[in-house]
Amino acid sequence: MNEAPAEKQKPQQGKRFSERLPQWLRQVLPRGSVFTHTDATLKRTGLATVCEEALCPNRTHCWSRKTATYLALGDTCSRRCGFCNIDFSKNPLPPDPEEPQKIAESAKALQLKHIVLTMVARDDLEDGGASYLARIIHTLHQELPESTIEVLASDFQGNVDALHVLLDSGLTIYNHNVETVERLTPVVRHKATYRRSLFMLEQAAVYLPNLKIKSGIMVGLGEQESEVKQTLKDLADHGVRIVTIGQYLRPSRLHIPVKNYVTPETFDYYRSVGESLGLFVYAGPFVRSSFNADMVLHNLQDKQSEIAKVPR
């Protein structure tokens, strides 16, 4: 009889195992009173953030700018993707009914003008957690009516009705990551499919044609340049307008190993490829889905304003 695979061991929060990095991936981490305030605000509410749970290398940078990405529906995922550090369980705890208000109170305390939510996959819930996310967004609209809201959602196992529930909540940006090129998807996220992700992105574009739709990929997993270019084309063809591209850094030795470190020049090249397809691309070694999300939205709006002024 085959033994069930052991659940992965999670590295201590805030610690990433040591791995020799190229020069362009070494950074000086800022700290100060703003970082301390952000940290204290989040700890006071007991909220989970993807910044901590996923061991994001940008946590110090973002918290020093008084920004954070809230992790909704708890801190335990019903999937176990090979790149991700978030805890796994087939039966996560029920969602906290007080979480929507806690997130709103935290966002108010941090005076967030652009609020970013992400979520653990909740395949154990009938709608994948879509209605619960919608509750959070409605609460945020009530408490911070002037703030924009960005949501990085799961694929809801292809449930379009669940997607519509989320989209009807009034978000500013809908984000769903394909994460990697099609060939590597079964290894990187075995409970998802590349085509299903494209389908959900396209369904969002069809349902709300004016909605800003975003997706992202990691590089350094062994993908070929031609595969990245094809992925960018696929995203453009399925209604995506914003794409993030960043270097994959494994959280521990238990995760998928890095195959290669992509140079800044290659990120610039991928950006130019995406822009030639009509995409707004934010690419760089430390770029993540929610990294500088407020600046990305602002720059996109500026670019759209410039285009609108061009005589036709």
UniProtKB/Swiss-Prot annotation:
Q: Where are the stretches annotated Disordered?
A: 1-20
**Cofactor(s) needed:** [4Fe-4S] cluster
Subcellular localization is given as: Cytoplasm
Gene3D superfamilies, per database record: Aldolase class I
CC annotations in GO: cytoplasm
User: Which positions bind [4Fe-4S] cluster 1?
Assistant: 51, 56, 62, 290
Task: List the GO molecular function terms.
Answer: 4 iron, 4 sulfur cluster binding; lipoate synthase activity; metal ion binding
Query: EC?
Result: 2.8.1.8
Q: Which SUPFAM superfamilies match?
A: Radical SAM enzymes
Amino acids binding [4Fe-4S] cluster 2: 77, 81, 84
InterPro entries xrefs: Aldolase_TIM (IPR013785), Elp3/MiaA/NifB-like_rSAM (IPR006638), LIAS_N (IPR031691), Lipoyl_synth (IPR003698), rSAM (IPR007197)
Cofactor note (record) = Binds 2 [4Fe-4S] clusters per subunit. One cluster is coordinated with 3 cysteines and an exchangeable S-adenosyl-L-methionine.
Q: What PROSITE patterns does this protein map onto?
A: RADICAL_SAM
Comp. bias (Basic and acidic residues): 1-10
Using the record's annotation, list all stretches that form the Radical SAM core domain: 63-280
Name the major location: cytoplasm
Catalytic activity line of the entry: [[Fe-S] cluster scaffold protein carrying a second [4Fe-4S](2+) cluster] + N(6)-octanoyl-L-lysyl-[protein] + 2 oxidized [2Fe-2S]-[ferredoxin] + 2 S-adenosyl-L-methionine + 4 H(+) = [[Fe-S] cluster scaffold protein] + N(6)-[(R)-dihydrolipoyl]-L-lysyl-[protein] + 4 Fe(3+) + 2 hydrogen sulfide + 2 5'-deoxyadenosine + 2 L-methionine + 2 reduced [2Fe-2S]-[ferredoxin]
Q: Which family does it belong to?
A: Belongs to the radical SAM superfamily. Lipoyl synthase family.
The name on file for this protein is Lipoyl synthase
- Native organism is Chlamydia felis (strain Fe/C-56) (Chlamydophila felis)
